[in-house]
C-alpha cells in the first residue's frame, strides 16, 4: 500500500472532475473511494444488508453519515417498510443527497439527535451510551450508533414510534472510533 499525503488546497478539489481524472491518470490501478464511501458500489453492497427474512419489519433504523447505508437499505426495502436514518451531522443536505440516489419515498432522516454535529457529544449522549452498554451488553460508539439509539429511545419515549411496529436497528460498527 502506498499513502500519499496531500495539501488542504488539493483536498478542496476532492470532488472536481479534473482533479479526479488527474488522479486516475497518475494511478491507473487505483480505486478512488469518495469521502464517506458513498458511491454506487457502496449502495449496492448496503442493499444486501436486508434479506428476505427482514420483510416483516415495519421500521428499519440506521445511522447516517454520507448516505450510502441508508440508500442501500431504502433500495432493498419494500414499500410498506419505513427506513429511518439518524444523521451524525446537522443540516438538510443529507435528505437532498439521498433523494438524488433513490426514487423511493419510504424513508426519512432526522438530525435532531446529532448532538452538535459529527463526532461531537453531549453529557446526555455519553450517559445514555454507558447505560445502554451496561444494560444490553452491546458496545456503541459516540459518532454514529450511540446517536442513533439515543434518538430512537427518545422517539419511543415521546410516543413517536408505534409500540406495535416491528423494529430492525442496524448497528453499522465504527467501534474502532470509541473513546
Task: Give residue ranges: language-model regions.
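Glycine-rich phosphate/pyrophosphate-binding loop at beta-loop-alpha junctions
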Residues: 41-116, 170-179
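Active-site-adjacent helical/loop segments in soluble small-molecule enzymes
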Residues: 110-113, 118-163
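Structural motif
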Residues: 31, 59, 166-168
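Hydrophobic beta-strand scaffold residues
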Residues: 2-4, 83, 140
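Terminal helix/beta-alpha structural elements that buttress the NAD(P)+-binding lobe
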Residues: 13-15, 54, 83, 146, ...
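Small/polar-residue-rich loop-to-helix segments that shape phosphate-bearing ligand pockets
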Residues: 1-55, 108-128
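Short, amphipathic C-terminal "tail helix"
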Residues: 154-179
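Alpha-helical scaffold segments in soluble metabolic enzymes
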Residues: 19-22, 48, 52, 72, ...
Amino acid at each position: 500500500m502506498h499513502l500519499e499525503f496531500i495539501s488542504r488546497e488539493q483536498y478542496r478539489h476532492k470532488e472536481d472532475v479534473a482533479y479526479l481524472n488527474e488522479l486516475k491518470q497518475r494511478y491507473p490501478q487505483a480505486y478512488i473511494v469518495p469521502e464517506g464511501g458513498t458511491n454506487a458500489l457502496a449502495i449496492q453492497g448496503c442493499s444486501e444488508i436486508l434479506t428476505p427474512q427482514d420483510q416483516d419489519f415495519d421500521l428499519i433504523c440506521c445511522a447516517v453519515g454520507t448516505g450510502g447505508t441508508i440508500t442501500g437499505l431504502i433500495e432493498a426495502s419494500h414499500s410498506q417498510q419505513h427506513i429511518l436514518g439518524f444523521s451524525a451531522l446537522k443540516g438538510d443536505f443529507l435528505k437532498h443527497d439521498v433523494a438524488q440516489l433513490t426514487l423511493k419515498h419510504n424513508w426519512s432522516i432526522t438530525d435532531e439527535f446529532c448532538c452538535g454535529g459529527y463526532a461531537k457529544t453531549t453529557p446526555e449522549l455519553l450517559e445514555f451510551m454507558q447505560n445502554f452498554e451496561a444494560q444490553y451488553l452491546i458496545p456503541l460508539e459516540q459518532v454514529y450508533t450511540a446517536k442513533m439509539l439515543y434518538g430512537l429511545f427518545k422517539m419511543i419515549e415521546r410516543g413517536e414510534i408505534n409500540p406495535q411496529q416491528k423494529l430492525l436497528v442496524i448497528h453499522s460498527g465504527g467501534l474502532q472510533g470509541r473513546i
